[in-house]
Amino acid sequence: MNAGLTPRRLSTLLLTLALFASPALAAGEPPAAAPLPKVDNLPLIKVPAKASGRDELAVLLTGDGGWAQTDKGLSEALAKGGIAVVGWNSLRYFLKRRDPDRSARDLERILRHYLPLWHKEKVILIGYSFGADVMPFLASRLPPDLAERVSLIALVGPSDSADFRFHPSEWLGKPSPESRPVMPEIEKLAGKEIVCAYGETEKGKTLCLKLPPGRVRLVPRPGNHIVGKNYGPIAQAILGHGRTAS
């Protein structure tokens, strides 16, 4: 009888070698998951979902007032509706100059950390005021595998230009000479659903009304640029997007 290496014996040999090469597989254990990227050096606030049935993770980049009334209230409203939120404090993060590419990589870290940790599939990107100016730059620079998971971008009170460092003069409405135009970055987000919220008294200043008709879903709300407690229409617009059955 020919005792050569038959296909059946070859298959058995390869399987045996694979089991010895991987003790976890030999023991019937699944392979260990890759470690989550660290986010300890970022000024983040965790607001876990308080209801089940939704698969979105929202990242909220705050205004230059930091984690304040509007950011807290909007995040809590979304969490009650089942959307987990990671708040990102712009005031602390942009105290030193950043650049769009580096900030986009930090957003990538946040998503690669919290998507698997909280078992979420889709991404909602929210920016308020200063954060709304910056968020399109970050969204347009995400790697393809994360970009395709972005189901909604919500911009609350965006202006024409963005700066990547906080200047106290901006509280007086004075743009920095280093600011960058926001419109070209929004144009890079073709195909993404965008919600743009603005105060009814800031119609002549908001970027929302300068965007091409039909490009975004407009959400007018009472008042001026400062949202305060008037975040209800914004929360409803976000919660009404992509609702999944529980």
Which functions belong to the PLM regions below?
Residues 11-22:
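Bacterial N-terminal signal peptides
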Residues 27-53:
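N-terminal cap/lid segment of alpha/beta-hydrolase-fold proteins
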Residues 48-81, 89-90:
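Short, surface-exposed "cap/lid" segments of acyl-processing enzymes
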Residues 84, 89-94, 159, 224:
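Short beta-to-alpha linker loops that shape the active-site pocket of alpha/beta-hydrolase fold enzymes
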Residues 97-118, 137:
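Alpha/beta-hydrolase active-site loop
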Residues 113, 122-177:
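Primarily recognizes the serine-hydrolase "nucleophile elbow" in alpha/beta-hydrolase
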Residues 163-213:
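The feature captures the conserved acid-bearing segment of alpha/beta-hydrolase catalytic domains
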Residues 215-246:
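C-terminal catalytic histidine-bearing segment of alpha/beta-hydrolase fold enzymes
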